[in-house]
Swiss-Prot record:
The keyword Kinase does not apply. It is a single-pass type II membrane protein. 3'-phosphoadenylyl sulfate binds at residues 69-75, 234-242. GO terms for cellular component: Golgi membrane. Residues 24-411 are lumenal. Pathway: Glycan metabolism. Belongs to the sulfotransferase 1 family. Gal/GlcNAc/GalNAc subfamily. It catalyses: 3'-phosphoadenylyl sulfate + keratan = adenosine 3',5'-bisphosphate + keratan 6'-sulfate. It holds the Pfam family Sulfotransfer_1. This is Carbohydrate sulfotransferase 1. One of its GO terms (biological process) is inflammatory response.
Length: 411
């Protein structure tokens, strides 16, 4: 009986491997089911086009925003979501993690990581080719006739909330709030979404579920893709403060430390150090400029984007070789000097961007900051984040803790 938990864990991991193998085998076959489509004329049109989605051999630009939770990735995602010629997806890898990784393991084991990364790369490759049917393997319950209401944060994608993918009677073309999209649009038709994807020149995907750029090498080197990686980093002290505020239960011991002034003996330090280790490993690879990343990698500090959003956005689009859309410029103008009361939603993007980047300095005690600086000193120096040497320095907004650095893209 003492080994029963090991047996359960082994069975769970075996089940994951079997699921993933089955998905790989099944998805090698056609997803196309013309008879199941009910829209007038749509089945015939798709049947004439062929039974499968072909690989896109044009030079579509495929953008991946590589980030971690609470690093400003939703904000960066909007810089692409607002572009009229970009098909943007918000965290599609959520479905992979939710389906393949048992909740009780939280995806921390090496075996979980290998399964997750293999499945994630396969899904990303398919999504960049506008094959949204592949996503159905990870949606529970499975879509019926390629329609579902279970796509994670569907409302965060403008295209999925606009005509022709969404066509609610009597509604205007503009749906402002994510919740409005979900309520007014009804079921998501993945066939229509795939058509909308193919009509656009570029595909952008945001993820916080790939630890580092090395994990993407197979996709970067895939000749069928034109993948460019925007790695978004943020001061780990700021990430810790934001997560403690947003995920109050998960980070309750950090909050307890802040409230009592005493460090809990059972504090999960990996909630901080994992971020620093992943940043350091990934950024080290990027800054070494290996040949496989030439023209494919750009490092962006959230703080630089927050201080000068228009300038940094122009640099990002120049690196990608995509013309900057006027809708993007307008969105930046309207959403980076916003009323702070409008940015309280934990995934909101309306904010005073410069103030938001510095807010962590008033949400952490100096003891916690000193601990974080000691644990993450290498990556702080690597990314140009200065140490706060006293409580007074930490709380003084006139003293910048961000060095001037010019992280140029590897061209």
């Amino acid at each position: 009986m003492q080994c029963s938990w090991k047996a359960v864990l082994l069975l769970a991991l075996a089940s994951i491997a079997i699921q993933y193998t089955a998905i790989r085998t099944f998805t090698a076959k056609s997803f196309h089911t013309c008879p199941g489509l009910t829209e007038t004329g749509l089945a015939e049109r798709l049947c004439e086009e062929g039974p499968t989605f072909s690989y896109n051999l044009s030079r579509k630009t495929h953008v991946l925003i590589l980030a971690t939770t609470r690093s400003g990735s939703s904000f960066v995602g909007q810089l692409f979501n607002q572009h009229m010629d970009v098909f943007y997806l918000f965290e599609p890898l959520y479905h992979v993690q939710n389906t393949l990784i048992p909740r009780f393991t939280q995806g921390k084991s090496p075996a979980d990581r290998r399964v997750m990364l293999g499945a994630s790369r396969d899904l990303l490759r398919s999504l960049y080719d506008c094959d949204l049917y592949f996503l159905e393997n990870y949606i529970k319950p499975p879509p019926v006739n390629h329609t579902t209401d279970r796509v994670f944060r569907r409302g965060a994608s403008r295209v999925l909330c606009s005509r022709p993918v969404c066509d609610p009677p009597g509604a205007s073309d503009l749906i402002l709030e994510e919740g409005d999209c979900v309520r007014k649009c009804g079921l998501l038709n993945l066939t229509l979404a795939a058509e909308a994807c193919r009509e656009r020149s570029h595909v952008a995907i945001k993820t916080v579920r790939v630890p580092e750029v090395n994990d993407l090498r197979a996709l970067v080197e895939d000749p069928r893709l034109n993948l460019k990686v925007i790695q978004l980093v943020r001061d780990p002290r700021g990430i810790l403060a934001s997560r403690s505020e947003t995920f109050r239960d998960t980070y309750r011991l950090w909050r307890l430390w802040y409230g009592t002034g005493r460090k809990p003996y059972n504090l999960d330090v990996t909630q901080l150090t994992t971020v620093c280790e992943d940043f350091s490993s990934s950024v080290s690879t990027g800054l070494m400029r290996p040949s496989w990343l030439k023209g494919k990698y750009m490092l962006v500090r959230y703080e630089d984007l927050a201080r000068n959003p228009m300038k940094k956005t122009e640099e990002i689009y120049e690196f990608l070789g995509i013309p900057l859309d006027s809708h993007v410029a307008r969105w930046i103008q309207n959403n980076t000097r916003g009323d702070p009361t409008l940015g309280k939603h934990k995934y909101g993007t309306v904010r005073n961007s410069a103030a938001t980047a510095e807010k962590w300095r008033f949400r952490l005690s100096y003891d916690i900051v000193a601990f974080a600086q000691n644990a993450c000193q290498h990556v702080l120096a690597q990314l140009g984040y200065k140490m706060a040497t006293s409580e007074e320095e930490l709380k003084n907004p006139a003293i910048s803790l961000v060095e001037e650095r010019d992280f140029r893209p590897f061209l």
